[in-house]
Amino acid sequence: MDDNRIRSILVLGGGTAGWMSACYLSKALGPGVEVTVLEAPSISRIRVGEATIPNLHKVFFDFLGIAEDEWMRECNASYKAAVRFVNWRTPGDGQATPRRRPDGRPDHFDHLFGQLPEHENLPLSQYWAHRRLNGLTDEPFDRSCYVQPELLDRKLSPRLMDGTKLASYAWHFDADLVADFLCRFAVQKLNVTHVQDVFTHADLDQRGHITAVNTESGRTLAADLFIDCSGFRSVLMGKVMQEPFLDMSKHLLNDRAVALMLPHDDEKVGIEPYTSSLAMRSGWSWKIPLLGRFGSGYVYSSQFTSQDEAAEELCRMWDVDPAEQTFNNVRFRVGRSRRAWVRNCVAIGVSAMFVEPLESTGLYFSYASLYQLVKHFPDKRFRPILADRFNREVATMYDDTRDFLQAHFSLSPRDDSEFWRACKELPFADGFAEKVEMYRAGLPVELPVTIDDGHYYGNFEAEFRNFWTNSNYYCIFAGLGFLPEHPLPVLEFRPEAVDRAEPVFAAVRRRTEELVATAPTMQAYLRRLHQGT
């Protein structure tokens, strides 16, 4: 029998996507496959931080056998227990602190990790909506149903000093340090070959398959499978394979970002255990806390503001002089390749797809795509069904996220600028419009396969197929003030069940008090982790 096994893989591009690809594929396929990374010699970069989601460690670092504390120390990492949305309901310029809503409450809400508790076969969100819409409570959804918001307010750690986990969390870190760490791990532990050179062109056979890539120094690097991690340039997928790019600007308007890094006094003001998403005149800004500094960037639409205007608004928010700052200006295309796998080329990361980092899905798209690639891994025959199924999986992953992000803008009550008014004119995709109608009718939207965080975040196959769940939709929709039109009708016939839900809400309040009394500050925990003091 002929040996049709893939024997060699060439990854074009380094960065987080390239080195994640090299590590994951080398680990998954073992020493029988030679993995090479072709990376242009490094240039100086402005480091602005990266935010992630909870399954990163289980799906990627655990798979590689790298302990959490080890990679965190190497990558200047801190914890992220939520995304806090600030000023998404009130008009005005970018502001780092919450304004007051008309009801007197501060204009912020939290998108939290972990699944909602259930009561009598319904998620707690439906009981909260019943109480809220019947005037029985005015407490916000996030603070009624989750224990974390009070920890966030007090800048407390999601782990005890002995490492015990108190709540679901993800991470903030320096993305360039992660890429450097994975490069060392790949070369030293997995025998990945690292070639520093500049790509010039690719060779194709009569079938249109890539046979080799060529470099400025005259190298010819042959392989059986090629992974395109060349970023927005999409060198192999877009230029060599000529795969069409599906523009998604009819759903999401933002197409630019201006970013900078600023100092932060951790001892004086503490370290926030969350990513901040701060609404601006023509988009939004992130704030990613790192040790001794934080990264911030204004993601905006060039239809409604200029690069200079965006930089000025960002600097006003942080009370710094634009003339004294070094900015990283980024133009990005919103959308995805029609297919991420064409013949013997697979695009991973930004070369395949991109949405703005509003929900920290950038790295997730990379390692989720790698998971699906290994699941559908080919041999040299490259049977079309493998690529077809992979392409359907990653397209659905992208489209679901695109729709969820669009709702953040479309359902916001803000209408104080051309940008916010324009967002409301964009149509939802048909499938997502149905989800919005389900929510308006009081129904749960996309129930999770389990509410046990250990099993939910521990079973990536189930999580991948059920990624944005009812908990996510309620955090954002209710947080924006977009409530169901009426409670779930069946609860009107079950008053006893509604009454019996009160102890569940009370248990959330008790657990919150317990955590506040025991959790260390983020600053104290990270000092012990990174400095051993």
Swiss-Prot record:
Active-site residues are K80
Family matches, as Gene3D superfamilies? FAD/NAD(P)-binding domain (3.50.50.60)
Detail which positions bind L-tryptophan.
E359, Y456, Y457, E463, F467
Write down the chemical reaction(s) this protein catalyses: L-tryptophan + FADH2 + chloride + O2 = 7-chloro-L-tryptophan + FAD + 2 H2O
- Xref: Pfam families: Trp_halogenase
Record-listed chloride binding positions: T361, G362
Q: Which InterPro entries match?
A: FAD/NAD-bd_sf, Flavin-dep_Halogenase_NPB, Flavin_halogenase, Trp_halogen
Site annotation Important for activity: residues = E359
| Family of this protein | Belongs to the flavin-dependent halogenase family. Bacterial tryptophan halogenase subfamily.
Name-wise, this protein is Tryptophan 7-halogenase KtzQ
The gene name on file is: ktzQ
